[in-house]
UniProtKB/Swiss-Prot annotation:
Source species of the chain: Synechococcus sp. (strain JA-2-3B'a(2-13))
Binding site for ATP: 245
Lineage: Bacteria, Bacillati, Cyanobacteriota, Cyanophyceae, Synechococcales
Motif 'KMSKS' region per record, residues: 242-246
Uppermost EC category: ligase
Molecular-function annotations in GO: ATP binding; RNA binding; tyrosine-tRNA ligase activity
Record keyword Ligase present: yes
The protein, known as: Tyrosine--tRNA ligase
Amino acid sequence: MSISSASVSPAYRDPLIAQIVERGVAEIFPGGAAALAERLAQADRPLRVKLGIDPTRPDLHLGHSVVLRKLRQFQDAGHVAILLIGDFTALVGDPTGQSEARPRLTPAEVEENARTYLEQAGKILDFETPGRLEVRRNSEWLAHLTLSELIELQAQMTVGQMLAKEDFAQRYQAGTPVYLHEFLYPLLQGYDSVALAADVELGGTDQRFNLLTGRDLQIWKGQAPQFCLTVPLLEGLDGYQKMSKSKNNYVGLTEDPLTMYSKLEKVPDHLVERYFELLTSVPLAELPQDPRQRQILLAKTLVAQFHSPAAAEEAQRTAQALVLDGILAETGSIPTFAIDGLSYPVKLSYILRECGLCKSAAEARRQIQGGAVRLDGQKVEDPDLEFAHASELAGRILQVGKKAFRRLVKGAD
């Protein structure tokens, strides 16, 4: 069943519009799916669709990709995606969902995180088609607000309204400090919509208060208020908590194909259809009936999206080859060995010694000649096998015997 139960008038059954307003949508306001569908159908210009991201972490996971995919759908329908880097608001810290104030980042940390965010967002958004994407930073306008302008902005909301925000209310009632600068965050995010003249703003369900603040400030400034579209928060691999790197229940967008595949083929049964709806374009009516086949299709589909179909096929073959004695070798629990510090070209026998799978290069050669060494489940037969670049090894599983493994990685994993 679709997450959104919204019904769209047959007059607006353009498949691109239907996908935008129906699939993977939690709420659209004001007016619901039909109102936004009508606005999209009757638009005489590309709409400006805003998504703000605060670069508080250096990497993205599948949970972040849900709203990025929704932004891409607007691009595919001919509208302008505005990817707003909250380099100024990141210095404040979004209090949403926080039981205490966020640690404040340095400008250098924010800029480095923004750089990696953009690299990873390029896996989903259209960065190539002219006129389909604007990348902006809210320091362009927020850093230049005068004190009088800031006071005028703060005068648009009361303390009572701020304390109605669930996160603030819970902390206030619990006696946990709520700092004045945190009250600024919803106002600054809302002011971004004014500065960008946004027609639509996207966000997770936890951003509802901030999105509505944007509408209020646009009305205050005499602009047409934006539509707000929220998407569900994706549960992590544990099956219940929001996907988060801190909870170790995530799938990173930059993970190698085998790691990504191995995690996704074990998504809990009750979440598989939800993952398909939020993370893919596969018609839900066409999903296999067999639960195991659904998991496999999900894993292959997402690896193909973020890597390639060939990488997905290879990851599936490798994962199957790593089934030993009926027990799947969990890639997340396999010790890692960093390969980017090696001098290339490098022999596999040297790697076997350095990573601790063999005590010496001579032992490594004997293990290879005895047929005990496998790379991604395939038996290695050449004791002099060597590799010219780290890219040939990254993400692969090195195995000696039945139970000794190393996952080869670039840098710290």
